[in-house]
Regions:
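Domain-level signal for soluble alpha/beta catalytic cores
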Residues: 1-361
């Protein structure tokens, strides 16, 4: 029997901002809209997004990242010890257009407030539906927060400090009733791919070493914390199709990841191109794998039959009840999809999930 609490109809928290919110952000930057006006626009956008997600039947609802100016702002805005913006560097070059705004860790890192407490509170004010909150993983932020040429020890220390901060935030979110937290780290997706590992080497990076170092930080979020029974904490490695998976996965980095990753839920890419599908054979039994089946970059809808065949292929390698279905990453404004196109993509995920699990969801 399917487990309702495995959240088979999945997504990645990030959604395409509505036109009204995009216009409000632009007006705020021009000084034509005050902070209160921007918050009102964010509140309206989140309320609309929650309603849409509920109608789509998604297992948990998010705020779409509509309150965040950039992917790492949840950390940068609430943690002291970050300095100026960093430009360039090997990791940023590997990520390419996917690289977020980065700031250098220059001093002791300490939380000055809750990272996502305001987001959780605002969601709880508009719905009693299960909530999804996404945070950047400590390993990801650490790799992006050290200037070029700094020793790996600096990255490890930064990762450990961030793991403690983010771990406390995850525990606080779980305690106040958030059902599902995703730690977002697309750098894994680049490093695990054969083409990405090759490009990393060209940039002077050792892919397996980076994977090990990030896992040490990300795994530390779990240290000494007991979560509620039906709380989910997952690791999201998806890149939204940005990583080149045409040559499959790199054996060394993949083995390092599969052997050490401690999470009970991971989000991976599982495209139509067979060699680009995340290898499921090495996944630890009992881990729920959320398959990224629907592309967030293209407006064209995938074939239902073709997606079903991919799920069937995955189910031949692992228990189908340990599979969830999703897109291949979060939706963003940069992807260029309209709100209607986004809804159709998510509706496709929901439709296929109900084909497999039906009324059990």
């Amino acid at each position: 029997m399917a487990d309702d609490f495995k959240y088979h109809i999945d997504h990645h928290a990030g959604l395409t901002p509505q036109i009204a919110l995009t216009e409000a952000r632009a007006a705020h930057l021009r000084g034509e809209l005050d902070d209160a006006g921007l918050r009102a626009a964010q509140d309206a956008a989140v309320a609309e997004a929650v309603s849409t997600q509920r109608r789509l039947g998604l297992a948990a609802v998010s705020d779409g990242w509509f309150r965040r100016p950039d992917p790492l702002s949840a950390v940068h805005d609430q943690v002291s010890g970050f300095g100026d913006e960093l430009v360039g560097g090997a990791v940023a070059e590997l990520l390419g257009a996917s690289a977020p705004r980065r700031r250098e860790a220059v001093g002791p890192l300490a939380a000055t407030g809750r990272l996502a407490g305001h987001e959780s509170a605002a969601l709880r004010a508009v719905t009693e539906y299960p909530l999804l909150v996404s945070l950047p993983s400590p390993g990801y932020v650490a790799e992006l927060s050290v200037a070029e040429g700094q020793q790996s020890k600096s990255v490890e220390e930064t990762g450990a400090a961030l793991a403690a901060i983010i771990g406390r935030e995850v525990a606080a979110l779980a305690a106040e009733g958030v059902a599902y937290v995703l730690l977002h780290n697309p750098l894994y997706g680049f490093l695990l791919s054969a083409r990405g590992a090759e490009r990393a080497a060209e940039l002077g990076l050792e892919a397996a070493e980076l994977v090990d170092r990030m896992l040490a930080a990300d795994a530390a979020v779990l240290d000494g914390v007991e979560y509620p029974v039906h709380f989910h904490l997952g690791l999201d490695l998806t890149t939204g199709g940005a990583a080149d998976l045409s040559d499959g996965y790199a054996a060394g980095p993949l083995a390092a990841f599969q052997e050490r990753q401690p999470f009970d839920r991971i989000c991976v890419e599982y495209p139509a191109l067979e060699q680009g599908r995340f290898p499921l054979a090495g996944v630890r039994p009992g881990v729920v794998v959320s398959l990224g089946l629907v592309d967030v970059r293209t407006p064209e809808l995938e074939s239902v039959d073709e997606i079903v065949s991919r799920v069937d292929a995955a189910a031949a390698e692992m228990d189908i009840d340990d599979i969830a279905l999703s897109t291949n990453g979060p939706f963003t404004a940069e992807n260029g999809l309209t709100g209607h196109q986004e809804r159709l993509k998510l509706q496709l995920v929901e439709m296929v999930a109900r084909y497999f699990w039906g009324n059990e969801l």
